[in-house]
Design a protein with these regions (language model features):
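Active-site anion-handling motifs in enzyme catalytic cores
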Residues: 1-176
Length: 176
């Protein structure tokens, strides 16, 4: 969970009877989760987070669950442009604090940052961002990345994906 998500929940928790946290990787914020155990239903996308949330006295199949990342539920056919594959490989490595090395590859396209921002609650913009990312990836045979959702989308598109770790366990944990 990013700090923006934490801050949003912290500032709005009083407005809701229950809060459903969709599949996430969560590190820290133990006070938030302990203090709101009666309000939260947490979906984890990997075992490290699942074990962490259980350690805060959440009960499996009651208020903590494990499931796949939401990207796996995407109806890909709604977004395909059916562009032919005509480029060899895309380097889509992080250029932010989650980069493991900060060593950026030649011709790097941190495409997730292109559409990052505060507009993910706008369904139209979110769908178009997803479409643009998929259309970009469609052109390539191979995708090299340390971004989780780029790796998932490229895999769903049938690309050869070389998936690298980020600065903490998220990528490896979701992969496993």
């Amino acid at each position: 969970m990013y700090s923006e998500g934490h801050d949003f929940i912290q500032n709005n928790i009083g407005k809701f009877h229950k809060v459903i946290i969709m599949p996430s990787t969560i590190r820290g914020y133990s006070d938030l989760f302990i203090n709101n155990i009666d309000k939260f239903v947490v979906f984890c996308r990997e075992n490290i987070t699942f074990d962490y949330i259980k350690s805060l006295n959440y009960e499996p199949n009651k208020n903590v669950f494990i499931t796949d990342d939401m990207a796996f539920y995407l109806d890909l056919n709604k977004y395909l442009s059916l562009k032919p594959v005509y480029k060899k490989q895309a380097n889509c490595f992080r250029t932010d604090s989650e980069s493991l090395t900060g060593d950026y590859k030649e011709n790097n396209h941190d495409i997730s940052l292109t559409w990052n921002g505060d507009y993910w609650d706008n369904e139209f913009l979110a769908r178009n961002s997803t479409r643009c990312m998929i259309n970009f990836l469609e052109e390539y045979k191979v995708v090299n990345t340390d971004r989780l959702h780029v790796a998932i989308l490229a895999s769903l598109l049938g690309k050869e994906v070389n998936f690298y770790p980020n600065s903490y366990y998220k990528n490896e944990a979701v992969y496993n």
